């Protein structure tokens, strides 16, 4: 089985996350997609509590599954006592599902610093990496794309210019966010009084 992994803070999950999940599922031809909410030790702003973030990501998975099946939430990262690293999550998944192939989904912004990630070479050994880049941005000239493809990295053009940070600011300011979030996620945020 081929499974893709999409991690992030998902604070909150938005239509860009949904579009990326749907595009990745089709372009990568995967049978399953794990959404992994994380505790990013490098994010300055505090995250919504874990219970709400898991619920929001569950709603995102349901939205993805409206057009097919196979999307589920991987809770391993968020259940760790301390922030974890991507290599630890992928090691856990490859040990838990030894016959599966995994593809890690990255945005181009994260890929630019990928060589600084903990044990990034081990990540490349354990799984394929799919980089979704903005079609309007040029590839960083210092990256040898041909060499990276040989190491198991593939590139796809994808543009969804939404930001969870900007959406949180709009919600806190009482500005409308219609069209930025799936309706089920917006409903949950409003019912729970989040991001005020």
Swiss-Prot record:
Keywords on record = ATP-binding, NAD, Nucleotide-binding, Nucleotidyltransferase, Pyridine nucleotide biosynthesis, Transferase
The Gene Ontology biological process annotation of the record reads: NAD biosynthetic process
Catalytic activity line of the entry: nicotinate beta-D-ribonucleotide + ATP + H(+) = deamido-NAD(+) + diphosphate
Extract the Pfam families matched here.
CTP_transf_like
The keyword Phosphoprotein appears for this protein: no
- GO molecular-function annotation terms? ATP binding; nicotinate-nucleotide adenylyltransferase activity
Pathway where this protein functions = Cofactor biosynthesis; NAD(+) biosynthesis; deamido-NAD(+) from nicotinate D-ribonucleotide: step 1/1
User: Top-level EC class, please?
Assistant: transferase
Q: CDD domains in the record, alphabetically?
A: NMNAT
Q: Which InterPro entries match?
A: Cyt_trans-like (IPR004821), NadD/NMNAT (IPR005248), Rossmann-like_a/b/a_fold (IPR014729)
Look up the EC number in the record and give it: 2.7.7.18
Q: Which HAMAP family match?
A: NaMN_adenylyltr
Its family? Answer: Belongs to the NadD family.
Q: What this chain does, per the record?
A: Catalyzes the reversible adenylation of nicotinate mononucleotide (NaMN) to nicotinic acid adenine dinucleotide (NaAD).
What is the name attached to this protein's record?
A: Probable nicotinate-nucleotide adenylyltransferase
Q: Which organism is it from?
A: Chlorobium chlorochromatii (strain CaD3)
């Amino acid at each position: 089985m081929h499974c893709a992994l999409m991690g992030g803070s998902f604070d909150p999950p938005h239509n860009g996350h949904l579009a990326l999940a749907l595009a990745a599922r089709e372009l990568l031809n995967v049978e399953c997609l794990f959404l992994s909410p994380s505790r990013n030790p490098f994010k300055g702003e505090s995250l919504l509590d874990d219970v709400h973030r898991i619920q929001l990501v569950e709603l995102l998975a349901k939205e993805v599954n409206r057009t097919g099946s196979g999307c589920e939430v991987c809770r391993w990262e968020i259940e760790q006592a301390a922030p974890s690293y991507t290599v630890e999550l992928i090691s856990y998944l490859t040990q838990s599902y030894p016959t599966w192939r995994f593809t890690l989904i990255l945005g181009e912004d994260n890929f630019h610093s990928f060589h600084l990630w903990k044990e990034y070479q081990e990540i490349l050994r354990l799984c394929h990496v799919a980089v979704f880049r903005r079609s309007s941005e040029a590839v960083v000239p210092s990256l040898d794309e041909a060499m990276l493809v040989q190491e198991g990295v593939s590139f796809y053009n994808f543009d969804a210019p939404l930001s969870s940070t900007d959406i949180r600011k709009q919600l806190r300011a009482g500005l409308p966010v219609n069209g930025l979030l799936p309706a089920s996620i917006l409903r949950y945020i409003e019912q729970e009084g989040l991001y005020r």
